Swiss-Prot record:
Residues 435-447 have a biased composition (Gly residues). GO terms for cellular component: cytoplasm; nucleolus. This is Regulator of nonsense transcripts 3B. It comes from the Eukaryota. GO terms for molecular function: mRNA binding. Its main location: nucleus. It comes from Danio rerio (Zebrafish). PANTHER family: REGULATOR OF NONSENSE TRANSCRIPTS 3B, UPF3 REGULATOR OF NONSENSE TRANSCRIPTS-LIKE PROTEIN. Residues 1-30, 197-467 are annotated as: Disordered. Residues 197-389, 396-421, 449-467 have a biased composition (Basic and acidic residues). The gene is upf3b.
């Protein structure tokens, strides 16, 4: 469609001119025809100049108008230049279109830009106005007003005083005039604003100083309070040290009490009733601390006499008595604590002793069982040798018994602490075993249960030997 439009001849515009009845008689109406002669070349390279365009369009037909417009950066990415041409002869338009429509322009970077040639939407062309020279240009020296100005200017320079005092007076007068001038509302507003800003700054600075002063005051009070607390703590420590010294002196003065226990009592009774002992000890202590009747009477009589003697001394005596009472209570507590500690240590020793005995009993029982097994094996081997009359058969068990003895001795030598079985704290029926093992003498397993076990093991050994 675009090519058809370009190839077709442009339409001619018909303009009708209306004439009045009077003009009709004088001038007949004429139809004026306007032909389209102005074209536009679009999509030119953005770096192209007017001189380069004219150079590339040569040879150009007769033109009366050529205007070039460079690319507009605000229309990115559509950065193209364009040119407008107005031909004098309408026939040259078709030839120009055939030549440059689709013509590829190349810029300095080597990029290709195919151009488009079409009629300009606005066909009017700016008229060329002849610039007339101004008649008054270069005639200022002859102007009367300019001459008057020069005379006035040169006369002031001649009249200017050379005395510096007069100059200073004139300058001061001028400054006074300037200062006496009224200020404008805008200047007043600015001055007022500056004044308010300075006042706020001063207020802020004053507040900051006050805050710092209060902070320093609080720190000083805190330091004083801390110092006072330290002094009080040191005083309390000194008092406590003095009290502890008195306490130690009283402890040294008091005789040490040793508790004797009956060895006939069983260990089970001690473990089952540990709570009854402290009560009995407390009762014994109360009996010891309780004074006799004569002492009570003497104390009461003495107290009555002191009350009769004088009241001001009672306060000091009461304080001294309270202190003595506190010291005695502290001593009693310390004594109880030591006694409990001794009792705990004694219980631990008993428990360790019992465990050791239990372990020793188990070890003895195992040794006896092993010795019994060995004896039975020897007896069984002897019987076997008696039944079998062959010398070779009798030699083999002897060798096996010797080998087993060597292995046992080597195993005993190899047995170390880490290879021994772990000690069991509690085994049910271990006490009965120890009692039964203790009365048997050297043979150990004489009971029926031990004999059965020995028989079973002997049978197993026989089966192994047969295999």
């Amino acid at each position: 469609m675009k090519e058809d439009k370009e190839n077709t001849r442009p339409r001619e515009k018909k303009v009708e001119i209306k004439c009045d009845e009077n003009d009709k008689q004088e001038k007949p109406c004429k139809e004026k025809k306007e032909a389209m002669t102005k074209i536009v070349i679009r999509r030119l390279p953005p770096t192209l100049t007017k001189e380069d365009l004219e150079e590339q369009l040569q040879p150009l037909p007769e033109l009366d108008y050529l205007e070039f417009f460079s690319s507009d950066t605000s229309l990115f990415p559509h950065l193209f230049a364009r040119a407008y041409l107005n031909f004098k002869n309408q026939d040259d338009i078709v030839l120009f279109r055939d030549r440059f429509d689709g013509y590829v322009f190349i810029d300095n970077r080597g990029q290709e830009y195919p151009a488009i040639v079409e009629f300009a939407p606005f066909q009017k062309v700016a008229k060329k106005r002849s610039k007339k020279k101004d008649a008054k240009s270069g005639t200022i020296d002859d102007d009367a007003d300019y001459k008057k100005f020069l005379e006035f200017y040169n006369g002031d320079e001649e009249k200017s005083p050379s005395n510096p005092e007069i100059l200073l007076e004139e300058i001061e007068a001028k400054t006074k005039e300037l200062s006496s001038k009224k200020t404008t509302p805008l200047l007043d507003f600015l001055k007022n604003k500056q004044r308010i800003r300075e006042e706020k700054k001063e207020e802020r600075r004053r507040r900051e100083i006050e805050r710092k002063r209060l902070r320093e005051e609080e720190r000083r009070k805190w330091r004083e309070e801390d110092r006072r607390k330290r002094k009080e703590a040191e005083k309390l420590k000194k008092v406590e040290k003095a009290f502890e010294k008195d306490k130690d002196q009283h402890k040294d003065e008091q005789p040490k009490i040793k508790l004797l226990r009956k060895p006939e009592k069983a260990d089970d009774g001690e473990t089952e009733k540990p709570k009854d002992k402290p009560k009995k000890q407390d009762r014994e202590r109360q009996k010891e601390d309780r004074p006799s009747g004569g002492d009570l009477k003497k104390r009461q009589n003495g107290e009555h006499r002191e009350e009769k003697g004088g009241k001001p001394e009672d306060v000091g005596h009461k304080e001294y008595r309270d202190r003595d009472g506190e010291r005695e209570r502290d001593r009693d507590r310390e004594r109880e604590r030591r006694q409990k500690e001794k009792e705990r240590i004694r219980r631990q020793d008993e428990e360790r002793r019992r465990r050791r005995e239990h372990q020793d009993g188990e070890n003895n029982y195992r040794k006896r069982e092993e010795e019994g097994k060995k004896d039975k094996e020897r007896v069984w081997e002897k019987r076997k040798n008696e039944h079998t009359g062959e010398s070779s058969g009798s030699a083999r068990p002897e060798k096996s018994s010797r080998d087993s003895k060597k292995e046992e001795s080597a195993r005993k030598d190899r047995l170390r602490n880490k290879d021994r079985p772990a000690i069991q704290l509690y085994q049910p029926g271990s006490r009965n075993r120890t009692r039964g093992g203790g009365g048997g003498g050297g043979t150990g397993g004489d009971g029926p249960a031990a004999e059965k076990r020995a028989e079973r093991e002997a049978k197993k050994n026989q089966e192994k030997a047969a295999e």
